[in-house]
Amino acid sequence: MRLWVLAIGSKMPAWVEAGVAEYSARMPPQLRVEWRGLPLARRGRSGDPVRWRREEGERILAATPAGAERIALEVNGRNLDSEALAQRIDTWFHSGRDVALWVGGPDGLDPALQPDWRWSLSPLTLAHPVVRVVLAEQLYRAWSIQAGLPYHRGGEE
């Protein structure tokens, strides 16, 4: 089973690459996370975010593995705490099905995309580079909960 993170934007600062690499390296080989940065739509002076989102949505769909569960990361998606995400990871792992996590560009995701469900990392608006690091850490945290590792100490005083 693989988790595919398909994110619009391919040029990330070094601190983002380092954070993503750190948490990805901690994941077990049987639960690999593949990060794929997809090019932004070419933005001109005319300013047509509908067209940009459509082009980026087409890139996301083209990069999504056939048969993968498709999850859109959106501010209005379902909120999950770390334990609920850990349960979700366990379900994905035991299904054997690949999972594609879609991260839109600066103008969001194309509304025409049809994800299997929508997930919100936070009700806050996060810069796209920050989303990648937070997502990497939360995927690792969820896996560590399932594996019984001491990394997560939620609810302890």
From Swiss-Prot:
Homodimer. It catalyses: pseudouridine(1915) in 23S rRNA + S-adenosyl-L-methionine = N(3)-methylpseudouridine(1915) in 23S rRNA + S-adenosyl-L-homocysteine + H(+). This is Ribosomal RNA large subunit methyltransferase H. Keywords: Cytoplasm, Methyltransferase, rRNA processing, S-adenosyl-L-methionine, Transferase. SUPFAM superfamilies: alpha/beta knot (SSF75217). Specifically methylates the pseudouridine at position 1915 (m3Psi1915) in 23S rRNA. Pfam families: SPOUT_MTase (PF02590). InterPro entries: Alpha/beta_knot_MTases, RlmH-like, tRNA_m1G_MTases_N. GO terms for cellular component: cytoplasm. Transmembrane segments: none annotated. One of its GO terms (molecular function) is rRNA (pseudouridine-N3-)-methyltransferase activity. The lineage of its organism: Bacteria, Pseudomonadati, Pseudomonadota, Acidithiobacillia, Acidithiobacillales. Belongs to the RNA methyltransferase RlmH family. It is found in: Cytoplasm. The keyword Cytoplasm applies. S-adenosyl-L-methionine binds at residues 73, 104, 121-126. NCBIfam families: PRK00103.1-4 (NF000986). Its EC number is 2.1.1.177.
